[in-house]
């Protein structure tokens, strides 16, 4: 599983790779070892060498998000958008940063932009659902987006988790419980799903807003 919806760069660059490609590979390897701060330091020279690298800016955005540096993450994602406006990963990453910055209208807009660019990818529909849930609005649209993600990839536990939260937001507790149980059957060790199910069962205190940090960033997806 990848750390989010950006395609991971190769950890070992091919022979003849540019200095920027070497930097991206090194930063990717460090990120995979859960050292985003060191990965940023490895990636900065790569971006200085090739500031037109979309993959480098996307990776930088992911690293900044992992470090809770949301404004720099947004700036990196915007660089990628400017370089490759047709690539859905950049607006989806920007959407995540915007949600964390509390800029919910912009987050929803960017999430839908990713869907428009690549409507067959469930990750973007999941991002729409999360943008709306985080904004605490348009719960029917969030539920529809989560259901669409499940339809596109019924084998990904995270999408059932998202669907469960959307159903809960709509007040459909029994359906939400079933969605969370489905998610946990597929991925029993997801603490976020465990907690939300406990909340529905009256065994834990409800959080003020849905969160998915700490277990799945953007919804992990098998690549």
Segments (PLM) and residue ranges:
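Terminal, low-structured helical/coil segments at or just beyond the last alpha-helical repeat
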Residues: 2-11, 185-223
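Alpha-helical segment of the N-proximal tetratricopeptide repeat
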Residues: 16-55, 59-66
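Helix-start (N-cap) detector for alpha-helical repeat units in TPR-like alpha-solenoids
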Residues: 20, 54-55, 88-89, 122-123, ...
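Structural signature of tandem alpha-helical TPR/SEL1-like repeats
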Residues: 32-45, 66-79, 100-113, 135-148, ...
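Canonical tetratricopeptide repeat
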Residues: 59, 93, 127-128, 162, ...
């Amino acid at each position: 599983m990848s750390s989010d919806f950006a395609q991971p760069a190769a950890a070992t660059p091919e022979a003849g790779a540019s200095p920027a490609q070497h930097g991206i590979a090194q930063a990717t390897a460090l990120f995979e070892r859960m050292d985003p701060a060191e990965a940023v330091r490895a990636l900065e020279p790569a971006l200085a060498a090739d500031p037109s690298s979309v993959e480098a800016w996307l990776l930088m955005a992911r690293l900044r998000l992992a470090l809770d540096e949301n404004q720099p993450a947004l700036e990196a994602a915007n660089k990628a958008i400017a370089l490759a406006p047709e690539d859905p990963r950049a607006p989806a990453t920007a959407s995540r940063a915007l949600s964390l910055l509390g800029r919910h209208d912009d987050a929803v807009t960017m999430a839908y932009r990713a869907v428009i660019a690549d409507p067959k990818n469930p990750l973007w529909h999941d991002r729409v659902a999360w943008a709306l849930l985080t904004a605490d609005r348009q719960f029917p649209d969030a539920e529809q987006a989560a259901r669409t993600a499940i339809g596109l990839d019924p084998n990904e536990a995270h999408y059932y988790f998202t669907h469960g939260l959307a159903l809960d937001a709509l007040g459909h507790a029994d359906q939400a419980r079933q969605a969370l149980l489905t998610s946990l059957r597929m991925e029993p060790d997801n603490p976020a799903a465990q907690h939300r199910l406990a909340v529905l069962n009256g065994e834990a205190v409800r959080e003020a807003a849905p969160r998915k940090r700490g277990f799945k960033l953007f919804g992990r997806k098998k690549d």
